[in-house]
Amino acid sequence: MRQELVMLAMLYIATAASSASAHHSHPYFYDECKSITIEGRVERVEFKDPHTWIFLRLDDGAAYTVDWAPLSRLTNDRVIGPAKNALVFGARVVVTGNRIRTLAQIREHFPDFTSDVNPNTVDPISIRRVGDSFSWALPPRANPPNCNGK
C-alpha cells in the first residue's frame, strides 16, 4: 500500500511538472532572437497572478501589451511595491523585450493551442521609466539562445 501511494505521488509530481513546463516554455511563445524596443505611456497595469500586464500606448497610436511575468512571481513588497507605484497611468516607459510568436509558430509546438495571439505582446527584458531612476531588468542569462542563422 505504501509503495502504491509513493508511486501515485511521484506520478502526480511528474505530471504537474510537465504541465507547468509546457505552460512556461518561454522560447515557444516569444522569439528570443528578435528583440524590440518600444516607448510609450502606461494606460493601465493589471497585477494578476501569475502574470502582470502593462498596457502601453505608443506615440503613433499603436497599443502594446507587456507580459511582465517575472514580477508577479516575486511576491515580496520590496519588488511589487515600488513597481505598483512606478507604473502608474501616464508614466512614460521604454521597454526592450521579445515579441510574441505568431499563432502558427506557437501551434508547431502546441497544436491544440486555441488562445488568441495579440501580435503586439512583448515579454520584457528591461523596463525603464523616462525622466527618473526607476528601472528593472532581467539578469544576464547563463545560456543565451543561439541566434546564428535566424
Where are these regions (language model features)?
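Bacterial N-terminal signal peptides
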Residues: 6-16
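Short boundary/loop segments of OB/S1/cold-shock single-stranded nucleic-acid-binding domains
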Residues: 20-36
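Short aromatic-glycine-enriched beta-strand elements
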Residues: 48-57
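A short macromolecule-binding patch
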Residues: 61-71
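OB-fold/S1-family single-stranded nucleic acid-binding modules
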Residues: 100-141
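Glycine- and charge-enriched low-complexity intrinsically disordered segments
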Residues: 138-150
